[in-house]
């Protein structure tokens, strides 16, 4: 008892280090050893985690964040919005078919993880400093001096997924007088603008000419966005608006202006033709072969390509949807890395920015610079020629065929275009007989046209989502694939690539055309148009929602619209 009392008094009066030493002595040093081991493990864990900064919360950024194993990374996200928007339904938001809140989901809800945390900063990145591995950001809260101070973030890996902005082609008056449809806020402004046009048109004191001008809705661009908005607007006016404003229903007009020869020119010709015929029946004026020269608050001037004639068209509201342009931060970054003058950042097939090994670019702000097989023919031939005989046997070729197909996907597309199954079919002689061996000239000749199948991927949500998911998979297997590379052979330097290159899989595309009709183009040359395609569109878009909450809200909005119609209130 005396010994214990003495130890107690000593413990109370001794410093912390002495207490640990005393306790460690009594317990054989196990506690001190545990403390040291625990501290060592924490340091090791912190050392392991690489800093990943993600710019943007669109399709590419969210797909990456959803699939990334963040136990291995310290993840920070910079985005001017704290939500993800299901952008394919933006045309539906413009007319109240779907409410804006129904297609957005908080990024913080999407990125909830059990074994880690993702930090989100609501800010704009205005400069990427790839030399010092930093991004410089500006908070979006400009009206609050305390919350608007610029800051910078360091990174080990940077994921650039900032998307693109509208391309005005330098046309005078577009920025000042046109609506765009890239964000949820754009859709809400258009919805208010449409209602405003009708409210103004029924005011007393206006001439019929003034009323017609205010009720003339012009869409510039015959791509999916422009066509879907035209269809939604037509349904909104016919099914709902004219019942509320019957006095001006005969004055309403919708015009779709397209510079090309046909609308929906990225779709199958059958769909393009069906869409034009349906719009004509619906009274939508489709004007093709016209180029917009300038826009004012009352008129839009277009040039007829066939005759060169300039035509002035009065308007009440214009939607400009003519493709995508480059954001200033991307233009500045491209100048830094020697890519000035491009529309999008050039990446390799692994989505790494050319010249920046630890910077990746995905989505609308990036474009894959596919490697041409003709530039590597000599290296491929040398790698396959195991006995250095100067000729390739079919057995030697078999050893590299899979690597060729993976590394150069244009070869597989070329084979399909020729209705062939195997590279050996390309190497057949002039009479179609299989060869036993080929020299380098015959090998080069057989693949000389393969690069003609190289195509730039479209700036769509489907492409961006697949790129984000692919990149997350690569990051999740980063350490594993350093030791055991899973990619194709490196024909120039030997060894194997760390990962398989990104390969886009096209699952088809839809074009809602109004009147409960849509057009669908699916793999395998499957084309459908009509009500069945519209119901397929409903099911696919409902299934692709990012959460059960948005899925339920979107389906509920569709049901509400069928029962009660669209709301025409201007809020």
From Swiss-Prot:
Gene3D superfamilies registered for this protein in UniProt: 3.50.50.100
UniProt note on regulation of activity: Activity is calcium-dependent with a more pronounced effect at higher pH.
pH-activity relationship: Optimum pH is 6.8-7.2 with NADPH as substrate and 6.8 with NADH as substrate.
Record bears the keyword Oxidoreductase: yes
Annotated organelle transit peptide span: 1-35
Catalyzed reactions: a quinone + NADH + H(+) = a quinol + NAD(+); a ubiquinone + NADH + H(+) = a ubiquinol + NAD(+)
Subcellular location: Mitochondrion inner membrane; Peroxisome
Transmembrane segments: none
Cofactor binding note from Swiss-Prot or TrEMBL: Binds 1 FAD per subunit.
Cross-referenced InterPro entries: EF-hand-dom_pair, EF_Hand_1_Ca_BS, EF_hand_dom, FAD/NAD-bd_sf, FAD/NAD-binding_dom, NDH-2, NDH2-like_C
Presence of keyword Metal-binding: yes
A GO CC annotation given for this chain: extrinsic component of mitochondrial inner membrane
Keywords attached to this entry: Calcium, FAD, Flavoprotein, Membrane, Metal-binding, Mitochondrion, Mitochondrion inner membrane, NAD, NADP, Oxidoreductase, Peroxisome, Transit peptide
Binding site for FAD: 51-81
Occurrences of domain EF-hand (ranges): 372-407
Listed PROSITE patterns: EF_HAND_1, EF_HAND_2
Binding sites annotated in the UniProt record for Ca(2+): 385, 387, 389, 391, 396
Binding site for NAD(+): 215-251
Cofactor(s) this protein cannot do without: FAD
Chain's role: Alternative NADH-ubiquinone oxidoreductase which catalyzes the oxidation of mitochondrial NADH does not translocate protons across the inner mitochondrial membrane. Calcium-dependent NAD(P)H dehydrogenase. Binds calcium ions.
Membership in a protein family: Belongs to the NADH dehydrogenase family.
Name the UniProt record assigns to this protein: External alternative NAD(P)H-ubiquinone oxidoreductase B1, mitochondrial
Species this chain originates from: Arabidopsis thaliana
Taxonomic placement: Eukaryota, Viridiplantae, Streptophyta, Embryophyta, Tracheophyta
Encoding gene per record: NDB1
């Amino acid at each position: 008892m005396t010994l214990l009392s003495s130890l107690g008094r000593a413990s109370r009066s001794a410093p912390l280090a002495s207490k640990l030493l005393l306790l460690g002595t009594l317990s054989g040093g196990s506690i001190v050893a545990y403390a040291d081991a625990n501290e060592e493990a924490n340091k090791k864990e912190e050392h392991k985690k690489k800093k990943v900064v993600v710019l943007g919360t669109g399709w590419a950024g969210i797909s990456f964040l959803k699939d990334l194993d963040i136990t291995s990374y310290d993840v920070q996200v910079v985005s001017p919005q704290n939500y993800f928007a299901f952008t394919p339904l933006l045309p539906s938001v413009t007319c109240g078919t779907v409410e804006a809140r129904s297609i957005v989901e908080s990024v913080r809800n999407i990125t909830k993880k059990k074994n880690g945390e993702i930090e989100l900063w609501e800010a704009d990145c205005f400069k990427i400093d790839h030399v010092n591995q930093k991004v410089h950001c500006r908070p979006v809260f400009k009206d609050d001096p305390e919350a608007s101070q610029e800051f910078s973030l360091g990174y080990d890996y940077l994921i650039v997924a900032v998307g693109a902005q509208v391309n005005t082609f330098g046309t005078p008056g577009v920025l000042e007088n046109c609506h765009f449809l890239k964000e949820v806020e754009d859709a809400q402004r258009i919805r208010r603008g449409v209602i405003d046009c009708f409210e103004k048109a029924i005011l007393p004191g206006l001439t019929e000419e003034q009323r017609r001008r205010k009720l003339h809705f012009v869409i510039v661009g015959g791509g999916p966005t422009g066509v879907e908005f035209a269809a939604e607007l037509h349904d909104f006016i016919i099914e709902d608006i004219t019942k509320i404003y019957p006095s001006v229903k005969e004055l309403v007009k919708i015009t779709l202006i397209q510079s090309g020869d046909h609308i929906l020119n990225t779709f199958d010709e059958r769909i393009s033709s069906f869409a034009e015929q349906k719009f004509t029946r619906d009274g939508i004026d489709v004007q093709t072969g016209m180029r917009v020269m300038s826009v004012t608050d009352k008129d839009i001037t277009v040039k007829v390509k066939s005759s060169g004639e300039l035509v002035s068209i009065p308007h009440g509201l214009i939607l400009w949807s003519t493709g995508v342009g480059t954001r200033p931060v991307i233009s500045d970054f491209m100048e830094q890395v020697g890519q000035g003058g491009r529309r999008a950042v050039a990446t390799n097939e692994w989505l790494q920015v050319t010249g920046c090994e630890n910077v990746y670019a995905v989505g609308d702000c990036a474009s894959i610079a596919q490697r041409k097989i003709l530039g590597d023919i000599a290296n491929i031939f040398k790698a396959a020629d195991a006995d250095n005989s100067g000729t390739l046997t079919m057995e030697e070729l078999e050893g590299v065929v899979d690597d060729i197909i993976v590394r150069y996907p244009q070869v597989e597309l070329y084979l399909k275009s020729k209705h062939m199954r195997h590279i050996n079919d390309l190497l057949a002689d002039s009479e179609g007989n299989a060869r036993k061996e080929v020299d380098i000239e015959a090998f080069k000749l057989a693949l000389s046209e393969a690069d003609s199948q190289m195509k730039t991927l479209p700036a769509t949500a489907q492409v961006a989502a697949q790129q984000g998911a692919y990149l997350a998979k690569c990051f999740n297997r980063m350490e594993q694939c350093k030791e055991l590379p899973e990619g194709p052979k490196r024909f120039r330097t030997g060894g194997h690539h760390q990962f398989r290159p990104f390969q886009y899989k096209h699952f088809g595309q839809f074009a809602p055309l109004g009147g409960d009709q849509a057009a669908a183009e699916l793999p395998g040359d499957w084309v459908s148009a009509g009500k069945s395609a519209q119901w397929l569109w409903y099911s696919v878009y409902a299934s692709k929602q990012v959460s059960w909450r948005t899925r339920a809200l979107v389906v509920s909005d569709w049901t509400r619209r069928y029962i009660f119609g669209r709301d025409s209130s201007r809020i």
